[in-house]
Amino acid sequence: MVRGTLDIEAYREKVESAHNIIRKWAHNTPILNSSAINSIVGCEVYFKCENFQKIGAFKMRGAVNAVMSCGITQKEKGFVTHSSGNHAQAVALSSKFAKTNAYIVMPKGAPKIKINAVKGYGAQVYLCENNEASRVETCDNIIRETGANFIHPYDNEKVICGQATCAKEIFEELNEINVIMCPVGGGGLASGTIISTKLYSPKTEVI
């Protein structure tokens, strides 16, 4: 198997650009720690509290960067994505900020509170079957009908660079971080965290 190499330095300008956008539209969330947890684990542990982010999740960073970095013509076409919750809300709110349409494909089994939140941001919600093929097919149909721009929940460079700003803010506030522990779902946050770590704190280990 051939493994490609990533030119991390080529991402510096992209991450800086993403952060300039995100500063205008999302929160620099607080970094907190707990003396109780520190005593249990025997080291200093800090939490980057993205639960205080707009829509309550880090997904806002990637979505707002993907939307706001588009040109006027692209924005006018609107945006489409598929998601069961947080990315759906993030694209919906980002599209509202951009004063354009959002077409959000969500599985029928998605929590009603998240479906209602997406609708509350003014997006059009399309319910589909609870499988990947149905999500993709529904998005493709919307794109053909509207010409809207598709924003993948994690397999999108602008989304990844947006998520990278979370770790960037950590390195701007804290010194000499030994380890960052990052959750992995689709991999957008993990990819962004690795990029920022290589750029701003290469001695830090990402787990």
Question: What is the meaning of each model-derived region?
Answer:
Residues 1-207:
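PLP-dependent amino-acid enzyme catalytic core
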